[in-house]
Amino acid sequence: MKIAVLGAAGGIGQALALLLKLQLPAGSELSLYDIAPVTPGVAADVSHIPTAVKIQGFAGEDPTPALENADVVLISAGVARKPGMDRSDLFNINAGIVKNLIEKVAKTCPKACVGIITNPVNTTVAIAAEVLKKAGVYDKRKLFGVTTLDVLRSETFVAELKGLNVSRIAVPVIGGHSGVTILPLLSQVQYAEWEEDEIAPLTKRIQNAGTEVVEAKAGGGSATLSMAQAAARFALSLVQGLSGETVVECTYVEGDGKYARFFAQPVRLGKEGVEEILPVGTLSAFEQKALEDMLPTLRADIELGEKFVNN
C-alpha cells in the first residue's frame, strides 16, 4: 500500500511522516511531497529509522511523481494559524493550494482515498469534491476530512476531568472541524457521569482547543504534533479498512445530506473507503440544540468551497 503526504515539509507533515514510518504495516511505501526543497532531506532523515516502510521525498512545483500509484493521499499543505486568526482566515491561501493539489490527484491517482487535513476543513473538503467532480472522478466513499484531532482532544479532556483511564474512553465527535461545528457527544461516553454544569464548558474547551495551542505557541505555530498524531491514527485506520479489516472512525464525509452535504460522524471504513456511515445515535437536549445551531455555519462553510470551484 502506498501513502502520499502532500505538505510533508511542514510542521504537521514532518511529524506525520515520522509517525507513519514507525507505524505503517511492513511493506508499505511512503511518499513525501512539498514545494519546499528540504523535502527529499526529510525523507532521507526519516529513512534512517529501521522499519520495513520504504520512503521517498519529492520537492518542486509538481506533486505528480509522489502521487503515482498512491492508494492513500493525505493533504496537509498550506499555511498554519497564527494568534488572532481563526480557521476561516486561512481560506484565501489554502483554498487555492488544495484545489491545485486535488487537480493533480484527479489526473495521477483518481482512485486513491484522500484525507484532507488542510484548514478550514469544512470548506477545503467541499473544494476537493467539486474539483474531483469536474474531472469526472469523484467517489464520495474516498474523500475524507480528517477531524480525528477533535476526537483525541475530547478523549484527553474527558479522561483528565473524570480521572479515567484514557485508553478506555471513546468520544464520538460530529458536525464539522471548526468552532461551534465541533460537537462532542459527551452524553454517549461510557463510564462518565456528568454534572449539569460540566457539559457546556467542556464542549467549549474542545471547540476552542486549537486556539489554546495557537496562543500558547505565541506566534510560533499551531497544533502540529497532536494534529500529526490524529492524522496518523486516521491514516492507519484507513489502511486497515482498505486491507479488509473493520474499523470505525469519526470523519467528515459526504453522506445522505440529512444535516449538511458534508458531516462528521462515525464511519465504518472498508475496502472502498467509506463502507457505511453510522447513525449519530441518541443526543441529549444540549447536543440536539448545539447541532441545530451549528448547521447554518456548517452549510455556509460548505457553500463557500463549492462556489470557489464553480464560479
Curated annotation (Swiss-Prot):
Keyword hit for NAD: yes
Amino-acid positions noted as binding substrate in the UniProt annotation, renumbered to this chain: 81, 87, 119, 153
Keyword flag Membrane: no
One GO term describing the cellular component: cytoplasm
Keywords associated with the record: NAD, Oxidoreductase, Tricarboxylic acid cycle
One of the GO biological process terms: malate metabolic process
The protein's Enzyme Commission number: 1.1.1.37
Residue numbers binding NAD(+): 7-13, 34, 94, 117-119, 227
Recorded catalytic activity of this chain's protein: (S)-malate + NAD(+) = oxaloacetate + NADH + H(+)
Entry-linked InterPro entries: L-lactate/malate_DH, Lactate/malate_DH_C, Lactate/malate_DH_N, Lactate_DH/Glyco_Ohase_4_C, Malate_DH_AS, Malate_DH_type1, Malate_DH_type1_bac, NAD(P)-bd_dom_sf
Domain of life, per lineage: Bacteria
Active site location: 177 (proton acceptor)
Molecular function terms, GO-annotated: L-malate dehydrogenase (NAD+) activity
Role description: Catalyzes the reversible oxidation of malate to oxaloacetate.
Subunit structure, interactors included: Homodimer.
Family (UniProt): Belongs to the LDH/MDH superfamily. MDH type 1 family.
Protein name stated in the entry: Malate dehydrogenase
Naturally occurring in which organism (per UniProt): Histophilus somni (strain 129Pt)
